[in-house]
Amino acid sequence: MYKRQKEYTITFAANKKTLTRQELFDWSQESDEQIRYYSGTATYKTTFRWKNKPNKDQQIYLNLGTVYNLATVRVNSVDCGTIWTAPYRANITGALKKGTNELEIEVTNTWANALTGADEGKAPFDGIWTNAKYRRAEKTLLPAGLLGPLSFSITE
């Protein structure tokens, strides 16, 4: 039915870091402090091949698996929606074509990890501040990013 390209290009908007990875990962577990303490939006790009033209009676969904905290999905530059609750899935029927498709997923996490990094002298980028009281006494980093696994589902 489909075949995904072997890698993702991930660009972190606030600090302009770009990574290429074979697998999805939790930003808060990354060794690079600019990624581990990152808060904001990162864009994942990859391609996949769809073998058949979608049937007019089918609805095709991209299932994102685990996401921290919200995601906007685009297929072939068509906005397929923003998702912030389970199930993390987007209807991509109207954007999908037979052959190679471009997939772009913007993922945004909370401000908590950047605030923790700034408190520890490990800010992932400049300009991190808040005028709100901290509500997290614990300094453990929160999971962040697109963890997947990505899959497709079809309904008729």
Question: Model segments located where?
Answer:
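An acidic-aromatic loop/edge-strand motif
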Residues: K3-A42, L96-E156
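Short beta-strands within extracellular/lumenal beta-sheet-rich domains
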Residues: Y38-K51, Y88-A90
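Residues that act as N-cap/strand-start positions at coil-to-secondary-structure junctions
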Residues: G40-Y44, K56, V67, W84-A86
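Aromatic-lined ligand-binding clefts that engage carbohydrates, nucleic acids, or primary amines
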Residues: F48, P54-N76, L103-V107
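Short, low-complexity Ser/Thr-rich regulatory SLiMs
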Residues: W50-N52, G94, I154
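A short, polar/proline- and glycine-enriched secondary-structure boundary/capping micro-motif
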Residues: T72-V75, I92, A114-T116
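Short hydrophobic beta-strand segments in globular cytosolic domains
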Residues: C80-G81
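A short, polar/charged loop-to-alpha-helix boundary motif
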Residues: W84-L96
